[in-house]
Amino acid sequence: MIGPAFLKQGVRHTDLGPIGDYPEGEYMVTTFVSSNEGDVARRTAFIRNNGFLGSQPSFTILSNHCAHLGCPVQPNGAVQYKQVSTFPGVTRLPVNPSGFGCPCHGGQYDTEGNRIAGPPVRALDRYSFSIVNGHLMVGKPFSVAYVIGLGAGAKIHVAKYSFPGEPVSGLESWLYPIQPPH
């Protein structure tokens, strides 16, 4: 009877509040609970409102898990420890990062999540998102090989979601051992 424990384990979209709560061009360290399991399912993401791309709102939503070993990445630069929490279950801290860094092994990322130094093998993972009734909904994470450009006009080279340490492009991605499904 192990089977039922593994049913319905898909990622649900989580409501992060009205898009107006995210100032254009500014990153917010956003902490949210991604399911009904409570605090054990708490996630943190770096969210920037990029304004509009055509007629659609554009957001950059970076995971805070380092692409090296999964340690928590921190913003490099000043953090305003003024908590902004206007939506239930969602906590936001405004930041103005010059990039992001991993304190564990020194991995460094630029403001688009590209790896710029240290041992990580790829860019920071991102979350998919949608806008429903004017609210930002965060969805499944996905891996990124690299990003060219900035903000709404950035070209994201998407890869299937991979564990930390797994290359997602180049020869290394073909040589890496096959991983179990996630």
Please name every model-derived segment.
Residues 1-91, 131-182:
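N-terminal pre-ligand scaffold of iron-sulfur
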Residues 92-152:
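Short Fe-S-cluster ligation motifs
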